[in-house]
Structures are given as C-alpha cells and as structure tokens.
Amino acid sequence: DALQPYAKVITGKAKTMDGFFKVHYVDGKYFFEIADSLFGRDILIVNRVVKAPVDAQKRKVGYPGDYISDEVIRFEKGRGDKLFVREISYLEHSADTLGMYQAVLNSNVQPIVATFPLKTVRKEGETTNYVIDMTDYIRKDNEMFSFTSRVKDNIGASSMVDDASYIDTLKAFPQNIEIRTVRTFQRKKGGGSGLEKLLAAFFATSTTPLTYELNSSMLLLPKEPMKPRLHDDRVGYFAVSYKDFDENPQGVKYKANITRWRLEPKDEDREKYLRGELVEPKKPIIIYIDPVTPKKWVPYLIQGVNDWQAAFEKAGFKNAIFGKEAPTDDPTWSLEDARHSAIVYKPSDIPNASGPHVHDPRSGEILETHINWYHNVMSLLYNWYIVQAGAIHP
C-alpha cells in the first residue's frame, strides 16, 4: 500500500504513549512509531507467564512469573516501504579492526524474522520516524511474543485459537515496552511431558484448550555494553559462551563472560572506591517480594536478601542489595516487567527453589532475576537437615 499522510493514520482519536519509541492506539490497532536513531540498536525481548491454566503446574511454564524465552532483535529500514526485524546472535565474536571480522560477518548473516509495510512517515528535525501496524503480529502466534516451538511441545499446545486470543494491554516506558496478551491453544494429541505422552497412549486425554496470559517486555539495551569479565573455570559463576576468532591467529578459542550485576561506584565516589573505602553503588540491586507471598514469610525473605549486604562489602560496596515489598499503589509496577527482580512465590509441591536470571548477551550484565520459591521447599530443607545433622541433633 502507498504511504498515507501521518494525520490520516495517527488521527485525532489516537491515544499516544511515549516510550523509547511512541506507541499509538487507534481504532483497536497498535502502531509503533520508530525513529531512525533506533535502527541497529539492540532490543531484548523477554517473555513470561502472567497466569497459567488450571492443570499446567507439572509443565515447563505452569506458574505466574515463569520464564518462557528471550531474544535480541534490531529494527532496520528494508527495501522499498518496509521495515525489517532481525534476530541477533552473539555466539561468534571478531573485532571490527581485525582481519577476520568481514569473514565472520559474512558467515553470520542475522535472519530477517519479520517484515512490516510502512503506514506513514514523520519528519522530526533531523530524525525520520517510521510508523508500522504491529497489531496482527503481536496478537497472532509467533516465537517473538509467544511460546517457542520447544515450549509448546512441552506444554502440549498445538495451534492457537485465533478468536480466543487477544492483546490485553500495551504500555510504553522510557527504557521498555510492556505487552500483555491472552493466548489460547488447542491441545496437541499425545503432547506434553513424557508422562503425559505415555498416559495418552493408553487413556483418553483432555481436549480442553489451554489459555495462558503472557507478558512480553521489550528492553532497549545500553548503546555501550558493560565491560565484560572473562570466566575462570576455577570460580563458580554462570557464564555466556562464544567463539573468539581473534585471540588465536591460527585457530578458534572458545571463551565465556561471567554473568554479573552492574555494580559501579558513583562518579563522585570513584576515588574513594579505588582507595578501598566502602561506597554505595550507582544502582543497588533491588529484589522485590511477590505480592501474593503469604505475609508471614515476607519479613524473613526480605531479611534473607539483606543478609547478602555483607558479601558485597567484600567487593567494596555498602548497601548494595535490598529486599523490598512490591509496591501496591503503583499502577505501572508489574511482577513480569523485565526491569524488576523478584522472589516469586509458587504454590507448588516441588521441594526446591531456583534463581534464573536474564542477562545482556553482549556483556553478561544481569538485567533482572526471578527467584522461584516453591511452597514445598521446606520439606527439602528438613530432609537436608535430617541427613546432615540428624545424628548429632540433641
């Protein structure tokens, strides 16, 4: 279609939200207005469960807050009146000042995963803003804003039920866009976990559709990544692996960067920090407590987080980490917002806890963590205590 005048697309009825790009809601449609200054910038998309089906607890994504997937994308101007979205991989590295760079680049073409026809264009000084209609792409089934094929296989989902799936809310902020959708899937015959597949071979299984409420966070990553720190196998850190083509001129070196929080001294405290004095970080780590956590546990979870302050003092930072109750009077706060870290309460019989995190794949910077605290974790701690200390307990 030919480009339309801006006022004909973004009419006076538009509800506009200002984020790192503008989002317009007009007559049931969501338009993204993307400045050309954002072309080539890395945007991290993180997908999580907000609400899960009644019988999903034994599956990979069966509880609110469960992580689904993440990927890095970039917008770019395509041929003609089109905007492209590329999915970006950081599995292979070569510096742009060295001889291998172009060869590595030619062997790592980043795939175009979506194309959007331009609806209109707006000039704003030296900047050109491109407007695309994202409604159908967000609402329909795709791995960017929904389940990956692997997760769908795990939960036993097949095709999405179009008329039972919709965009619930979309909100824009300076560093992120939050999209909430409701998605209903037909059950895959004989799908789901290994046990479900085995039972399906002998018994009739439910044909009731699966309805999930999902949240997708689009985070604008820093233009300059945090300085990475190389992984050392002798030290117990999680790490991001990649192939390096520069260090060995006659071979390939497999390297990894540790994942770590971006704790930096304030500019005015840098000299104190370098002298070994304790200083407060520019941005402390805040771990919120899931608002649905039973109230009797909240003070102890907060204290458990705060107890880690002593460990960070060994690294030169005081007041580096805090546990806090989730705000109940802030309508913009959400447990699924990928800017926020949280301890998430899971009403589950799983006797465990886990601490997965989301990081910047370029540097290993931890952006947030959702620590899973399962209701039945006390049985694990009890059994550990009996095994390890039962023989000497008075």
Task: List each model region and its residues.
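Sec-exported extracytoplasmic/periplasmic mature domains
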Residues: 306-317
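Auxiliary tRNA-acceptor-end handling modules of aminoacyl-tRNA synthetases
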Residues: 1-293, 311, 320, 326-394
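Stable alpha-helical elements in mature extracytoplasmic
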Residues: 297, 301-304
